[in-house]
Amino acid sequence: MDRVRIGVLSHAHGHASTYCQAMRDFPDVKLVASWDDDQTRGRQAAQAYGLEFRPDADAVIKDPRIDALIIASETNHHADLIERAAGAGKHILCQKPMATTLEDCDRIIAAVRRAGVKFSMAFQMRQDPVNRKMKQLLD
């Protein structure tokens, strides 16, 4: 079975830990490496989830063993990290919100389209049964 090899860019958002916890049990996923601009937080998370810690984001972004990246940094860093990740041909799951400005959203969209990589925002609550029912009632 082929495994999707995952890298994590920052553990600033708590959901990064949730993703890593869940993915450790997926037979078709391998957690490979992570980076965090807070090296203490990054090293602790890497150790907890069996990731290699890298003190440089580009070392994770350019790692040929990594297929996709989870970006869970502070929102003001999303556009820069996504441009670099997409440019390296990595598929991306980005923690919400996408960006702090419309200009950065446009940069992200352009980078992903230019690179032809898969991109998803982590808006998982759209599929929550209660939210779907509320939407149905409003429609």
Short names for language-model regions:
Residues 2, 99-139:
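A contiguous active-site-proximal alpha/beta segment in oxidoreductase catalytic domains
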Residues 26, 63-64, 128:
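Acidic-histidine catalytic/liganding microenvironments
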Residues 1-49:
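N-terminal Rossmann-like dinucleotide-binding module
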Residues 32, 54, 120:
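General small-molecule cofactor/ligand-binding pocket signal
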Residues 22-26, 45-48, 83-88, 107-115, ...:
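Alpha-helical structural signal in soluble globular domains
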